[in-house]
């Protein structure tokens, strides 16, 4: 589903990852992170896809909201598990969306 974002400007966090073979607890944690993100101030929506690489784009009102999400206690735990057992590599990019269009 394509996220229904407001009129720009707003911010996008692009999380690109490659997975390890380990799956233990991943699906549950992924579901929990979506639920938790949706409760955070400034969260606007997200889009996600996975094949050989995974790409999740989450949308946020401002940079402070992104910082607060990054430092959320449960999210910090998920980040730790991701580094230790679920991801063989990842990259995070933060962008300001100045224009969007579509139908």
Show the residue positions of the predicted features.
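C-terminal structural segments of small proteins and small subunits
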Residues: 78-85, 89
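Short S/T/G/P-rich N-terminal loop/turn motif that feeds into the first structured element of a domain
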Residues: 1-54, 63-71, 87-103
């Amino acid at each position: 589903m394509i996220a229904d974002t407001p009129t720009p400007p707003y911010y996008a966090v692009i999380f690109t990852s490659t997975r390890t073979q380990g799956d233990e607890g991943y699906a549950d944690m992924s579901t929990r992170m979506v639920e938790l993100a949706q409760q955070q101030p400034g969260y606007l929506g997200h889009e996600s896809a996975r094949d050989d690489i995974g790409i999740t784009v989450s949308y946020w009102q401002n940079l402070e909201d992104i910082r607060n999400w990054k430092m959320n206690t449960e999210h910090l735990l998920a980040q730790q598990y991701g580094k230790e057992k679920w991801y063989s590599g990842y990259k995070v990019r933060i962008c300001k969306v100045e224009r969007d269009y579509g139908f």
